[in-house]
Amino acid sequence: MAGSKIALVGCGTVGGATAQILERDREFLSKRTGCALELGYIVDKDFAVARSLGLNEALFEKDLDTALADPDVSIVVELVGGTTTAKEITQRALRAGKHVVTANKALLAHYGVDLIQHARSNGVTIAFEASCGGGIPIIRALYDGLVANRVEALYGIVNGTCNYILTEMVNRGERYEDALATAQENGLAEADPTLDVSGLDSAH
């Protein structure tokens, strides 16, 4: 079975959960994909979240270049968020000939076209299904399954965090602050929820 070593960059709420899944379900994912997936690096400046989750400290790496220089790393998962640092990380990974997976819709909204072209010119892929709909496979359906259709409208929940908060406020009479705190406790909102609750995430 062919193998793919993964460098996960950014170990916050989403990154930590992703690392846990990659470690916990390694055999299951390898069987389902036909590819031996291995989490090789967790790259971040601060490993407080990673340590709190009990992740393997042997995987911790502060220097992205170390991960990119590893010839066994074929996939970089970008979970830093924002656009500036995330763009730099993504470009560096693509230049190094690594496939990139990102859930960063802000990055894609601002630089998606350029990054996709950059990936193609380096013979690799940038995958971003996780950036929309909580990973529901809608992007591939639109790109592949509906390629011959004229899509005139899409309806759905624009932001899961806001949807949760508003549902709690309407159905349970929760105060905004309490609903937000509960969302954060349940991993449905980042420690800094500004991007979600300001409407910027929805705009992206």
Model-derived features with residue positions:
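Short acidic, glycine/serine/threonine-rich loops at helix termini
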Residues: A19-Q20, S52-L55, G112-L115, P137-D144, ...
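A short hydrophobic/small-residue beta-strand
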Residues: H99-V101
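N-terminal glycine-/serine-/threonine-rich beta1-alpha1-beta2 phosphate-ribose binding loop
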Residues: M1-R95
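Active-site catalytic pocket residues across diverse enzymes, especially alpha/beta-hydrolases
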Residues: L22-R26, A119, L146
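Rossmann-fold NAD(P)-binding glycine/threonine-rich loop
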Residues: A86-A96, K105-Y143
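Core active-site phosphate/anionic-ligand binding loop and the adjoining beta-turn-alpha structural block
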Residues: R120, T125-H204
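Catalytic beta/alpha-barrel core
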Residues: L79, A103-A106
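Generic structural signal for well-ordered, non-membrane alpha-helical segments
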Residues: C11, G15-T18, C35, T83-A86, ...
